[in-house]
């Protein structure tokens, strides 16, 4: 069905319908799209030493990325001289900021085959902004934010190489982006490569409801909103290789942003489906995150409205290749996996069900590999993951507030984590301290990795997170520390807060003695005093088992081999409680809105006395986790109501019988209620693969109800809501996953001797079109643009508009529309455009409607 109307649209380059195509091939694709500094460039200098012979020329416009924590340290300059075969350029103005340009090496201090060296490369990226083919919005757009936009839809094709898109995008308008595949489904063979998008008012490159697009060697610089934007979750199989995005700015507010995440979660690479390939890309500064792989439960918005993706769950899809990517100078994170943003309110939700899930759609461990990722100068966490599973291999994380915040069942292998490197420029770190691996929900395994630069008073290679659901089964194996005063462990959260119950529920198993010198010992944090808002330490030592010693050089309690540690949690407990261990340590004022949590030592003849500081809830559950099968913990509750019933434990007649019981048991002795929890329910498989700790974690759950009734043994009516039985561990990267580029589908034309020429007045019956005219190119006609021109609009209806490559040409128009198998062409793949060509999209009326019906009956080349 032919297109008959274009409503509320202006300043566009658009192709609609199968067979319609936009072909732009500029000769500047032969230049390097971006490179890095080869040595540091300091403030006041005006010469850049570059890694590559770039092919850049005098007059080219470039941008130098920030290498500090502030993306705003990026700056633009014009080249006035080229030296050393293109490996050095002289700038029109001195630099206003320092830009780091050195590499650093770290070694694990071992010899022979065990030796390992890591290279930290924080050299500034330098990007080419200008190209000889330019598509741009008008100058007024710098005031009103109404630039041009380009789009292909309904089966049209787009092949872009060596082009510059400047002052594009229309601020606050959904769908009005600089470059945009719109609901295209499979576009195998289409690409955007070695092009630049800069000073955009609405994102960079958009892939929307489209699969198998190819983006390579592009630069997206200084945008409002996301840089590389995969829009609805229906985008998969797309390949992004060696692209650079930096200075992605947040929209002013949610109300005015086209989507709310542009204001609250803006990212250089916004990926709403893990089934895409990202290789060698760089995110060099955004107001939120570098890379964010969002967890979508369903395809949303216009893609969902097509009906093509009913029942398709983006977050359940297998990961594509994620390898060799780098992110820095991001206000929050270098890499985020999981979580979700409400695109109406802008609220970021990290919690279930917003986890990357894969598998069978349940909240299980996920098999994926993050390979060779480098993240530095992140204001928050370099790597932030919500969801279980995954392997992080050969990472380099440096100069971040916190290196990792992983949900659990993940491995970190062959990685380097640095608190402060040689590129520590004194930028303030949130909270004032640097932490490496944050120990959180389920077990993490850290192997064959090196830590350096954590020498500040409250710095630590390992730290615990303050929230609940922490694990005592984190493990390290073959980890090493730089001889620079690095602290292995800090008992503080990254923000310096130690006043939550998660502080008391962390354990780190030293499998091979990497930290303690003795294989199998377990580190737990020493907490002697906290502020008292959520918990008060009355008697210290709660986190130390029998025989534990405190090692100040490590910063933690060292528990002897064989110590069994679990986590005890009370849910639905709004009443503060005091917990006293039978050998003396005591916590009081334990309170939270929905649960409390603390560490317990199993099978040590210890009894934990729980005394509610008021009437307990009428119903609460008691869970113990992170224990080997059959391990037990004994609790004594003081003055529970007489009519309290216990679900999940068998009644026994004496305390001795309870002590000897092999299953979960309850014994009442006057006002005291004794509970024995025995871990028999498989929770998850550990990743350690070492006999130093049991490879499986078990749990138990008992429900306490006030209000009468009998004790009901194992009839627990609230099953655990999390299936964590999927084994996790090292995931092998599959080379078969690496994408192969589909053959190009570019379809261009040669200019023929008899083709009509814009400069030929006979084509126009003696009067060339003017600024108020619309040019129509009908089916079978070819119009060659060979001179500068300014018109109100151009409609290519089945014909072709080809820009001749004999001189520099400027074309100004409100819009250029290609329909019904028409073609707009600048250069060809095997013969790129050599001269300068600039298309300026000057339309500035967002309410403009174009009624095409009067044109569809026309033939030939006409002025309308």
Q: What are these model-derived regions, one by one?
A:
Residues 1-36, 55-75, 88-152, 156-158, ...:
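Extracellular beta-helix/beta-solenoid repeat scaffolds
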Residues 2-12, 21, 28-36, 129-143, ...:
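Acidic/polar low-complexity surface segments
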Residues 51-61, 746-779:
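Acidic Gly/Asp/Thr-rich repetitive segments characteristic of extracellular carbohydrate-active
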Residues 73-83:
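Short beta-strand-centered aromatic/proline hotspots
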Residues 156-159, 188-193, 210-216, 234-237, ...:
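Short "repeat-start/strand-capping" segments in structured domains, especially the N-termini
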Residues 290-302, 307-315, 320, 334-374, ...:
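Long, low-complexity intrinsically disordered regions enriched in Ser/Thr/Pro/Gly
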Residues 717-766:
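Right-handed parallel beta-helix/beta-solenoid
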């Amino acid at each position: 069905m032919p297109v008959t109307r274009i409503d509320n649209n202006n300043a566009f380059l658009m192709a609609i319908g199968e067979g319609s195509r936009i072909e732009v091939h500029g000769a500047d694709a032969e230049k390097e799209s971006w490179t890095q500094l080869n040595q540091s460039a300091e403030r006041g200098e005006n010469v850049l030493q570059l890694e590559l012979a770039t092919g850049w020329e005098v007059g080219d416009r470039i941008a130098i990325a920030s290498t500090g924590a502030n993306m705003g340290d990026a700056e633009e300059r014009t080249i006035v001289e080229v030296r050393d075969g293109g490996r050095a350029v002289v700038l029109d103005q001195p630099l206003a900021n320092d830009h780091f340009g050195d590499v650093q090496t770290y070694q694990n201090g071992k010899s022979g085959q065990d030796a390992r060296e890591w290279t930290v490369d924080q050299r500034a990226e330098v990007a080419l902004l200008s190209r000889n083919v330019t598509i741009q919005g008008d100058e007024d757009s710098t005031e009103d934010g109404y630039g041009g936009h380009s789009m292909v839809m309904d089966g049209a094709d787009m092949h872009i190489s060596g082009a510059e898109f400047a002052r594009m995008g229309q601020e606050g308008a959904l769908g009005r982006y600089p470059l945009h595949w719109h609901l295209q489904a499979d576009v195998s063979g289409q690409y955007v490569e070695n092009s630049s998008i800069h000073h955009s008012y609405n994102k960079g490159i958009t892939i929307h409801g489209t699969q198998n697009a190819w983006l390579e060697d592009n630069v997206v610089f200084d945008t409002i909103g996301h840089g590389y934007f995969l829009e609805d979750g229906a985008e998969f199989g797309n390949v992004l290789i060696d692209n650079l995005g930096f200075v992605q700015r947040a929209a002013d507010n949610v109300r005015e942003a086209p989507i709310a995440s542009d204001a609250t979660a803006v990212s250089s690479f916004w990926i709403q489906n893990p089934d895409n390939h990202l290789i060698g890309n760089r995110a060099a500064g955004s107001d939120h995150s570098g890379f964010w792989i969002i967890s979508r439960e369903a395809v949303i918005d216009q893609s969902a409205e097509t009906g093509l993706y009913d029942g398709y769950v983006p977050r359940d899809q297998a990961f594509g290749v994620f390898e060799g990517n780098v992110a820095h100078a991001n206000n929050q994170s270098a890499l985020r996996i999981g979580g979700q943003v409400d695109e109406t309110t802008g609220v970021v939700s990290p919690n279930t069900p917003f986890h990357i899930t894969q598998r069978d759609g349940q909240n299980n461990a996920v098999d994926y590999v993050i390979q060779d990722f480098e993240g530095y100068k992140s204001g928050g966490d370099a790597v932030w993951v919500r969801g279980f599973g995954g392997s992080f291999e050969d990472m380099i994380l440096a100069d971040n507030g916190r290196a990792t915040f992983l949900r659990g069942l993940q491995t970190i292998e062959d990685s380097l984590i640095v608190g402060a490197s040689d590129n520590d420029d004194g930028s303030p770190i949130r909270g004032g301290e640097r932490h490496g691996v944050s120990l959180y929900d389920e077990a993490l395994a850290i192997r064959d990795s090196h830590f350096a630069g954590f020498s500040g008073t409250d710095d630590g290679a390992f730290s615990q997170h303050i929230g609940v659901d922490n694990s005592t089964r984190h493990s390290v194996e073959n980890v090493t520390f730089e001889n620079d005063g690095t602290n292995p462990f800090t008992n503080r959260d990254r923000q310096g807060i130690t006043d939550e119950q998660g502080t008391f529920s962390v354990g780190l198993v030293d499998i091979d003695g990497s930290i303690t010198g003795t294989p199998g010992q377990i580190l737990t944090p020493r907490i002697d005093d906290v502020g008292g808002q959520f918990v008060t330490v009355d008697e210290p030592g709660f986190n130390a088992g029998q025989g534990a010693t405190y090692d100040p050089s490590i910063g933690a309690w060292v528990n002897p081999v064989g110590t069994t540690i679990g986590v005890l949690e009370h849910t639905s407990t709004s009443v503060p409680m005091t917990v006293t261990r039978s050998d003396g340590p005591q916590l009081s004022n334990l309170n939270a809105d929905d649960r409390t949590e603390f560490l317990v030592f199993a099978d040590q003849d210890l009894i934990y006395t729980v005394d509610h500081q008021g009437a307990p809830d009428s119903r609460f559950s008691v869970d113990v986790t992170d224990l080997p099968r059959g391990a037990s913990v004994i609790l004594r509750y003081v003055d529970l109501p007489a009519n309290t019933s216990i679900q999940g434990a068998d009644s026994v007649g004496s305390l001795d019988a309870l002590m000897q019981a092999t299953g979960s048991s309850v014994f009442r002795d006057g006002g005291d209620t004794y509970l024995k929890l025995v871990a028999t329910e498989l929770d998850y498989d550990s990743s350690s693969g070492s006999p130093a700790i049991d490879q499986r974690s078990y749990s138990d759950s008992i429900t306490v109800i006030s209000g009468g009734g009998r004790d009901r043994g194992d009839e627990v009516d609230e099953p655990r809501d999390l299936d964590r039985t999927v084994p996790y561990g090292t995931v092998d990267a599959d080379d078969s996953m690496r994408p192969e580029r589909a053959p190009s589908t570019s379809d261009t034309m040669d200019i023929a001797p008899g083709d009509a020429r814009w400069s030929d007045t006979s084509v126009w019956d003696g009067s060339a079109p003017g600024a108020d005219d619309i040019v129509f190119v009908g089916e079978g006609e070819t119009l060659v643009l060979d001179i500068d021109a300014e018109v109100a609009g151009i409609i290519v209806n089945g014909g072709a508009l080809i820009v001749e490559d004999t001189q520099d040409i400027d074309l100004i128009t409100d819009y250029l529309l290609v329909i019904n198998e028409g073609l707009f062409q600048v250069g060809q793949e095997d013969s790129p455009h050599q001269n300068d060509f600039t298309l300026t999209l000057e339309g500035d009326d967002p309410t403009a409607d174009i009624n095409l019906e009067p044109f569809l009956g026309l033939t030939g080349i006409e002025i309308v």
